[in-house]
Curated annotation (Swiss-Prot):
Residues 263-317, 392-414 are annotated as: Trimerization. Glycosylated by host. Palmitoylated by host. This is Glycoprotein. It comes from Chandipura virus (strain I653514) (CHPV). Residues 1-21 form the signal peptide. Glycans are attached at N184, N344. A lipid is attached at C498 (S-palmitoyl cysteine). Belongs to the vesiculovirus glycoprotein family. The chain crosses the membrane at residues 474-494. It is found in: Virion membrane; Host membrane.
Amino acid sequence: MTSSVTISVVLLISFITPLYSYLSIAFPENTKLDWKPVTKNTRYCPMGGEWFLEPGLQEESFLSSTPIGATPSKSDGFLCHAAKWVTTCDFRWYGPKYITHSIHNIKPTRSDCDTALASYKSGTLVSLGFPPESCGYASVTDSEFLVIMITPHHVGVDDYRGHWVDPLFVGGECDQSYCDTIHNSSVWIPADQTKKNICGQSFTPLTVTVAYDKTKEIAAGGIVFKSKYHSHMEGARTCRLSYCGRNGIKFPNGEWVSLDVKTRIQEKHLLPLFKECPAGTEVRSTLQSDGAQVLTSEIQRILDYSLCQNTWDKVERKEPLSPLDLSYLASKSPGKGLAYTVINGTLSFAHTRYVRMWIDGPVLKEPKGKRESPSGISSDIWTQWFKYGDMEIGPNGLLKTAGGYKFPWHLIGMGIVDNELHELSEANPLDHPQLPHAQSIADDSEEIFFGDTGVSKNPVELVTGWFTSWKESLAAGVVLILVVVLIYGVLRCFPVLCTTCRKPKWKKGVERSDSFEMRIFKPNNMRARV
């Protein structure tokens, strides 16, 4: 069934292709991107798709310029984590030892992070783990190691102000070389410590088209601006602002383009038509802005925004996503934005810059397109693919199938639907321990304990634990019996030893005359009596 539908779709496309020989799309400028898992609570929706100006409007173009930033769309850096790893020995007076391990989060110092970062770059940074226990009798002793860990972490860049932007930063942005995060035990350090002058950034040439009603008097409220980076910018919400010594205007989305004071429309100077921007106005980028902040009141953009939010609702409910759902999350106009894909069942995103490209149709035999203009040279627009069921998937739902390379959003726009566009796949956000709550500080007061890893707590069990095998127990029994017999023998022999030690005594009433020596002195009659 699927193959027959695919064949019919390809046949249908073959008839439609001549009518759409130059299909204009907004697509990532690089053929490969650096993908990261989408974390929970992410609901970024880009600015709506490009508007088509009314046929009755007169269009004129003028050469302008826009800052592209002194840094790329993302900046390399490192997260520095600090914790105290503690081994506690509770040595009781009656014998047992209680050994516990715990981890305590602490705020790293600048010197600790610099030292650890130098070791990390040289490949000598190691985690010592828990220290060995140090036990003192009848006391509680702590042994601790200060463990500093370094992990690479890329952040976005606000091209205009030179600020780093990331959900981990407090408030979502940072302009220092040592940035606090929502986790008190972690700080972010940029890989390049050099401070850049904002006005030292490059300004790229840009052709801006201005549309107006030629039947009415030219005023700011009746002007619409358009460029390859700006889809539909209303003059009514545009103001005049000097930036780095250049005259220019700031669009409603916060982006700035130069506008020469000599530029005219129907012999009327364009720059004075706009009012001055309020004092303290900053030039901003909308890359990290929330979808609700860039949503305008025009009905053409409400649909895109609703479809995008509906897709995030599916992600939140952990429902499977189709390639068409992914296309709703992507930017529809040139400029900085985010691209989405599915990698091993995980919804992933990447920072990118969308550029205008022209393709032969919504279904291609090869992933090739023309840049700069419809008359340009065709080149590969994408080379990075991931497994997606029986097919492969690229950015924003772009499918690599047996029937060709399909762009779901553009196929639906032409009323072409097939089963492959609705192929479902698990695409859940990653449960990362660092959830992006940029407006609050994460609670790092919790301490991690690994429980009692010491010896027995019972003195009786402690004694019986001395004998770990039956041989030792038998030997102990024999020794005990011998000791008892020895003690009994000593007690029995003690009276005998005491008797032999006594001295002889003379009997009372025995005269010494009975001795042999005295008999010779006795008379005979006395001897006879004796």
